[in-house]
């Protein structure tokens, strides 16, 4: 993680979740990553990742997804990505990703997910690593535009909490997880 404050949050989160051995790096993954991988005998020991790549990067962020997937041998990835990332300039990366990995699900997220920060429409892509996507593979598409939360515009919010569970949000997220995990 390149941002120091986010790095600290990530480390604290892992410790609170009982994983004190996570080797989270504070720095640019393109500069620090190769050193880390070299020191781990050219393997990336993760079998799962959660990635929110910068949408301004090549392929609308899919270059980061492609790189993360290429460093894993097995496992799964969850990517919070610009919904149209797989088309236009992202098309080349999407094709390369699917040649080696399987898209399990695409989850359309609420329009106001990043209200006050960004107006980009996002989706979560769930991917199985190192299993080429076949033409007859079933992909689950979920419209999760109504997730049960009400959000306030972060720039205009006067409340400390701008996210309120107003319509069974926790149950809705549990249902989506159950659908995706089978």
What is each residue range found by the language model?
Residues 26, 43-182:
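A conserved structural/catalytic subdomain of Rossmann-like adenosyl-cofactor enzymes
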């Amino acid at each position: 993680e390149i941002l120091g404050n986010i790095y600290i949050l990530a480390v604290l989160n892992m410790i609170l979740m009982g994983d004190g051995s996570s080797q989270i790096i504070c720095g640019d993954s393109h500069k620090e990553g190769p050193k880390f991988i070299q020191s781990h005998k050219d393997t990336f020991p993760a079998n799962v990742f959660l990635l929110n790549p910068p949408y301004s990067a090549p392929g609308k962020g899919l270059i980061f997804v492609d790189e993360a997937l290429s460093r894993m041998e097995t496992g799964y990835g969850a990517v919070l990505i610009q919904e149209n990332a797989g088309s236009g300039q992202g098309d080349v990366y999407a094709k390369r990703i699917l040649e080696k990995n399987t898209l399990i699900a695409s989850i359309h997220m609420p329009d106001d997910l990043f209200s006050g920060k960004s107006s980009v429409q996002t989706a979560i892509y769930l991917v199985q690593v190192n299993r080429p996507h076949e033409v007859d593979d079933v992909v689950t598409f979920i419209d999760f535009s109504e997730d049960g939360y009400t959000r306030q515009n972060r720039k205009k919010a006067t409340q400390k909490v701008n996210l309120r569970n107003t319509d069974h949000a926790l149950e809705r997220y549990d249902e989506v997880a159950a659908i995706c995990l089978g």
